[in-house]
Amino acid sequence: MSSLVLGLHEIEKTQLSLVGGKGLHLGELSKIQGIQVPEGFCVTTVGYQKAIEQNETLQVLLDQLTMLKVEDRDQIGNISRKIRQIIMEVDIPSDVVKAVAQYLSQFGEEHAYAVRSSATAEDLPHASFAGQQDTYLNITGVDAILQHISKCWASLFTDRAVIYRMQNGFDHSQVYLSVIVQRMVFPQASGILFTADPITSNRKVLSIDAGFGLGEALVSGLVSADCFKVQDGQIIDKRIATKKMAIYGRKEGGTETQQIDSDQQKAQTLTDEQILQLARIGRQIEAHFGQPQDIEWCLARDTFYIVQSRPITTLFPIPEASDQENHVYISVGHQQMMTDPIKPLGLSFFLLTTVAPMRKAGGRLFVDVTHHLASPDSREVFLKGMGQHDQLLKDALMTIIKRRDFIKSIPNDKTAPNPSRGNADMPAQVENDPTIVSDLIESSQTSIEELKQNIQTKSGSDLFRFILEDIQELKKILFNPKSSVLIRTAMNASLWINEKMNEWLGEKNAADTLSQSVPHNITSEMGLALLDVADVIRPYPEVIDYLQHVKDDNFLDELAKFDGGSKTRDAIYDYLSKYGMRCTGEIDITRTRWSEKPTTLVPMILNNIKNFEPNVGHRKFEQGRQEALKKEQELLDRLKQLPDGEQKAKETKRAIDIIRNFSGFREYPKYGMVNRYFVYKQALLKEAEQLIEAGVIHEKEDIYYLTFEELHEVVRTHKLDYQIISTRKDEYTLYEKLSPPRVITSDGEIVTGEYKRENLPAGAIVGLPVSSGVIEGRARVILNMEDADLEDGDILVTSFTDPSWTPLFVSIKGLVTEVGGLMTHGAVIAREYGLPAVVGVENAAKLIKDGQRIRVHGTEGYIEIF
């Protein structure tokens, strides 16, 4: 068997590097019993390499291309064009020509063929590369087919293919092209079959797009397609398009576009029987490959031919269930303000820390809420809580509940909270003593200091046992009933204030102002403390100039050579000693902390120096406190004028005191958790250094791709199959490209919610109002905190914020996020800083462009773009 040209039936599963993704799948398809694949052969990558390997000019151009970035579009275009020209002019090796001629003689030279590209970086489980290289239809004759083989080779360097490889991290010099030559099928109809619904991701629904003639009309967007949906062997939906034209093959070669007769334009492309037959074929192919497929098909002489099948790479994985029942899962990341994927060690630690059972999928965590939705009472309580947190999530759950047949109902749970109790109930009777919070904080800090001391003597298996024991201590602190009551009481007090002040005084969201500058909020204090760091640096221009150019994380050691450098270093070290364990995505223990990468803080410090006068941190806090006191007095005075006013004022005063005394504590348990996480991490990284010295791992960060239990075993035995690390790194790269759903079912269906809002201005973008007020300003769309370049008065637009973003809040005048709820980080800090904010705005960072002027309506929950 020649390695230059292979028949489709000769292709083996291990030959990706020879035949590319498309060739590999066609080889597999041709072996499935009952699946019709047009006969053909593959000119392998060996033939391509043999044709170009001696061309020195081409190698120079490839080296130049490798040095470019995606932004260098003009240079990419020029170099790619030169490469294509060289490849077109290269002689095809004589043994390749001979082998091609032999196969064509075997299949019939007189027939027409499709000549199709198949790259080694194409149709892979993690990157489809669909449509990046060229396909040519209805080619007749040996010479013409050889010419089009060269064209396919050259199409490896179209601008779009080059840019796509850059975006997906593939090396141009390591991607090769094979060419598939297949007997041409002249179909009456053709199209695409998805074995999972491409809109909802439901794995039980097949979706068929169908049109007359060749499939190129659909792929190129020339015509609209009929769309058929099939579930459990039944057609559940039909949408018949007006098909005005189709592409057909010409007898003399090539293709042509033809108008469809008007009486046929609305005709159903496939009969119902054919739709169901095609669906069965799709399920058979999916079962063979073991995952949902994107299948190209055509119908000729009442026979379905399959001309391609590739994995659907955009589906979010389904959380695993232990049974075959229907399940509903909600995203933990949307509640934690962290929708990025988490590495295995991070997932492992979070699962060890939490008390709620969770499922993993796509590098994220999900909670199975099926039981909560099954009984009427627990459902009402649960949905009420979700509505306060995330209205889009609640609406998605309501969509599932309305189907009635998806979740089996169970009797009411007698232990469930009484749903009849409303928000307007007076907050539970707790001792309204601010020292309770101080005592809880002091106890947590003492425990952390003890941990830091005790862990220093631990190593090897002792360290892992010690960490497991300390996590139990962490859980006691995190889920301390006293802490939970304080936080819940403060939340209820805010809800009570908002409801009663609206009812009694017609004033919306009064609790927002009352929540400004509360004591003991470790997160908002963190933002103000960085203003104090800026105050230390501000008098020293040499230090400021140095910081503007710093890139090395060892910069703190260099500061001493400048006037004011020692003071700057000490101020930053003091800041890091209290807040250095924080970072973006901090619930993932593997994320790089500020103490590990202090340059992260530099842009924020410089922004503070640029945007603010000295001592502004204290003034901001005091201003917020005075506004809260003023609002309190105003409300109490107005209430006393009402019937039964003294009693109303008394109840309101108590609720306000609860907000002022307790609401700041809400941010503290998480601060304690990430504090401990950083201590654990530093100890584990010392173990990683030992593993590097022993040759078990290549770099410290390799341990992030092991679970806690796996890492313990590796430390104990010094044995590891490194392929596990490599595979999980590839998986993580794939997960980074996926957007996690708020709600996903056990069928894989992604159920989305929507806001039910009326009477909004034309073009308004809707979200959840979480901090009242109206502000107009320049939108700064920032997806990475390190890229922040803010001016006083800007409005921050981003996907989500967690506590690490708080230092930016001192510079902005408003907030818009894609993810969030009433009590999530951004909302809480926005209220404390007095910033109008709207969260849960779908695709905000795409709909709003950086630099646009926008108006944020924090009271009503929408944004206007000007």
Swiss-Prot record:
Disulfides per UniProt: none
Reactions it catalyzes: rifampicin + ATP + H2O = 21-phosphorifampicin + AMP + phosphate + 2 H(+)
GO molecular function, one term: ATP binding
Chain intervals for the UniProt region annotation (Rifampicin-binding): 326-754
Chain spans, region Swivel phosphohistidine: 767-865
SUPFAM superfamilies in the cross-refs: Glutathione synthetase ATP-binding domain-like (SSF56059), Phosphohistidine domain (SSF52009)
UniProt region (ATP-binding), positions on chain: 1-313
GO terms, biological process: response to antibiotic
Main EC class the enzyme belongs to: transferase
Domain of life (superkingdom): Bacteria
Pfam families, A to Z: PEP-utilizers, PPDK_N
Keyword ATP-binding: yes
Residues covered by region (Disordered): 410-429
This enzyme's EC code(s): 2.7.9.6
Residues reported to bind ATP: K22, R116, G131, T135, Q182, E296, Q308, R310
Active site (UniProt): H825 (tele-phosphohistidine intermediate)
Keywords for the protein's UniProt record, in alphabetical order: Antibiotic resistance, ATP-binding, Kinase, Nucleotide-binding, Transferase
PANTHER family xrefs: PHOSPHOENOLPYRUVATE SYNTHASE-RELATED, PPDK_N DOMAIN-CONTAINING PROTEIN
Entry-linked NCBIfam families: PRK06241.1-2, PRK06241.1-3, PRK06241.1-4, RIF_Ptrans_rph
Note on domains (UniProt): Contains three domains: an N-terminal ATP-binding domain, a large central rifampicin (RIF)-binding domain and a small C-terminal swivel phosphohistidine domain that harbors the conserved histidine residue essential for phosphate transfer.
Family per similarity comment: Belongs to the rifampicin phosphotransferase family.
Job of this protein: Catalyzes the phosphorylation of rifampicin, also known as rifampin (RIF), leading to its inactivation.
Name under which the protein is recorded: Rifampicin phosphotransferase
Native species: Bacillus subtilis (strain 168)
Gene: rph
